[in-house]
Amino acid sequence: MQRSLRHPLTALLSPLGALLLLLPGLARPSPQEPATAPPDKRELEGLIQEYLELGSCAVGPERERQLEIQARLSALPDLSAEEEARWRKELQKAWEKLPGLPAEKGDNWYFEDPRRGRYIVGGKRSKPAGLLIGMHGGGVGSGDAGSIAPLYEGAAARQKWVALFPEVLEKTERGWTDAGTEEWILDLIEQARRSFSVDADRVYLAGHSMGGYGAWTLGAHHADRVAALAPAAGGPTPILDRATGKPTDIDWGVIPSLRNVPMVVYQSRDDPQVPADVNQLAAKQVAEARARWGGYTDFTYWEVDGQGHGLPPGGAEAHFERIRGFVRQARPKEIVWQPVLSWKRQFYWLAWERPAEGALLEARLDREANRISVTRQAGAGRGGGPGLAVYVDAELVDFDRPLEVLLDGQVVFSGQPRRRLEWLLETSTSGDDARRFSARVPLEPQAAR
């Protein structure tokens, strides 16, 4: 699937250009100067635009190009606190100038040739209080955005949310995570935030049946980007006992990563299509995770009887009322992450250039001691591993004192983090200042860097 943000900006950003002049070392190099000379104003402006256009899900040659751009920016000097503050504003302005949704109301096709990527826009489109992604049910050969929109749109409007109802790109059993749909959903979220000026702290995922699976799974994969989740009559992927067919475990990458995300999971015991045992097991595992790691304080399992495969008593409005007050916990002191996506390189303030599938990370921030501790358990998945790091800035830790960073109990960094433009840019692709950081500390011994 081709990525969606491939539209060059039509004009240079004049405020950005003015800021570039303030950076030292930006005179145009002569032909005799080495290739490592800092980029000049015009080149830097173009590099920033190109990087942001490549987006937060870049893979393959697109990610390689982003890394090349970061390498060019590494020739620039460190930033002062004042320069960092100015760059934050200008990078946000640059992100906001990227395209919004192709159409901002009604029933639409995102891709025209061939026609695919159907999405419906509804709810409150003028100054919304939040963004709802409403996820339809279905399976192999079935699934229709038009089936969920009538059930959710009115309830979303009453919460003063703008609502997007996407249709999976391929109608499979796991349509919300197959065939590029997951990346497309993130693009839709970012474009909707630009189109409707939505607060990044108020993005909600909800879905019914397979859409409940989508809310569980995308919500876990991108827990750092959502305020709350409301799956109904659908659960995460179970691992089944071969002899009995009963669920014995939940697929990796879900329960651990949800530590800091509010959820209200709805299930009817008599559901003939999605048996209650999967969500019952998931709720049990959440309780076990809470005992192990803490957190999960706003997880609710709402089980009734007699509703079959329908919505909860009171419909979507009753479900949304239970999540409406939540805002994203954007910078938690404790993080648990079990990565499953090669292109998900940032999770809160953790960074992993090549995340190891199924590995388990626990990270803890001690602000009083100005210390970050990370522990890592190897995963059962394939590949990945290099590039593990933590992002920091002067709001997360105290830049006036030495920062200590530990990996598996061993000190890997002790000193003053450096404010760098390349890290501000790397963490600006989602246009979210709470996920934007000015320093990056590799989780490897300093002598090995």
Segments the model singles out, each with a brief description of its role:
Residues 138, 168, 269-272, 306-308:
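Acidic beta-to-alpha connecting loop that harbors the catalytic carboxylate
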Residues 338-449:
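C-terminal beta-sandwich/jelly-roll accessory domains of carbohydrate-active enzymes
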Residues 125-175, 238-239:
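Short substrate-entry loop that stabilizes the transition state in hydrolases
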Residues 32-130, 411-413, 418-432, 448-449:
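A domain-start/cap signature at the N-terminus of enzymes
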